[in-house]
């Protein structure tokens, strides 16, 4: 795994254009900024082309979608393809809300996505496989997570991150698992949104190998969270959220390498 991409990201300070979830937009902006990327958000379709042109990558989040925003997503996705900018899709709650799944599938047919990042329920829904999702949470099911992720990647010809206690990253054939992290991520709304945008940041500095970028993104965020949790003396979700921003700013390649649990 090319963990030196973290240093590359910090040296290049890539702009990440986010069509954001308004519930978590501040956390995403702060996390990207701390890591070394430059976040930019917009809900205005009239400036879509300029935003795509100046960005290194685009992250499209379905968290708080509206009809107007869906139109913007479609325009932005097509422009990103036109200008050869990587696109990351976060299909929030598509496993629990049929309309969201309908929207996500329509977007995936309108433009090419480079990475889809979702939990088990979301990825299973896109792949057409059985899973009982629970709102924005993964829910439960009996399917093999690797097979679910691979099926989704093959169907949409992209890289897929099925995130959870162990992140599964696949391009449809190759598979990497990242087992770092902490249960405190599940107590912090927006952890998945932040991961999706961090993935976009890494694809901006590795556009020809988004599979590698996805792996590094998962390991950096999971590793940073694990390091924060190891210093806490109690279950403190709010402290974790604040300290995570600090750690994203300070974490080094060597620190991540030391604790990496990658299969």
Swiss-Prot record:
Binding site for ATP: 117, 163
Pathway annotation: Cofactor biosynthesis; thiamine diphosphate biosynthesis; 4-methyl-5-(2-phosphoethyl)-thiazole from 5-(2-hydroxyethyl)-4-methylthiazole: step 1/1
UniProt-listed Enzyme Commission number(s): 2.7.1.50
Organism: Lactiplantibacillus plantarum (strain ATCC BAA-793 / NCIMB 8826 / WCFS1)
Purpose: Catalyzes the phosphorylation of the hydroxyl group of 4-methyl-5-beta-hydroxyethylthiazole (THZ).
Classification via Gene3D superfamilies: 3.40.1190.20
Pfam family, one: HK
Record's protein name: Hydroxyethylthiazole kinase
């Amino acid at each position: 795994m090319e963990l030196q991409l973290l240093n590359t990201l910090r040296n290049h300070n890539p702009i990440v254009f986010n069509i954001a979830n308004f519930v978590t937009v501040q956390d995403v902006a702060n996390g990207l900024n701390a890591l070394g990327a430059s976040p930019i958000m917009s809900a205005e379709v009239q400036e879509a082309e300029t935003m795509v042109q100046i960005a290194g990558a685009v992250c499209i989040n379905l968290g708080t979608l509206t009809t107007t925003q869906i139109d913007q997503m479609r325009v932005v996705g097509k422009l990103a393809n036109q200008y050869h900018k990587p696109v990351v899709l976060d299909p929030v709650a598509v496993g629990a809300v049929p309309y969201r799944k309908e929207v996500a599938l329509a977007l995936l047919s309108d433009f090419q996505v480079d990475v889809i990042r979702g939990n088990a329920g979301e990825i299973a829904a896109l792949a057409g496989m059985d899973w009982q999702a629970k709102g924005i949470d993964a829910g439960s099911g009996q399917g093999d997570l690797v097979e679910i992720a691979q099926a989704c990647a093959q169907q949409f010809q992209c890289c897929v991150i099925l995130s959870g206690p162990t992140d599964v990253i696949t391009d449809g054939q190759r598979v990497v698992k990242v087992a770092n992290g902490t249960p405190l991520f599940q107590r912090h709304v927006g952890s998945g949104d932040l991961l999706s945008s961090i993935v976009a940041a890494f694809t901006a500095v590795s556009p020809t190998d988004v599979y590698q970028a996805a792996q590094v993104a998962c390991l950096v965020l999971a590793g940073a969270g694990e390091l924060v949790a190891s210093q806490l003396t109690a279950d403190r979700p709010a402290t974790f959220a604040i300290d995570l921003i600090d750690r994203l700013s300070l974490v080094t390649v060597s620190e991540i390498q030391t604790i990496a649990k990658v299969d």
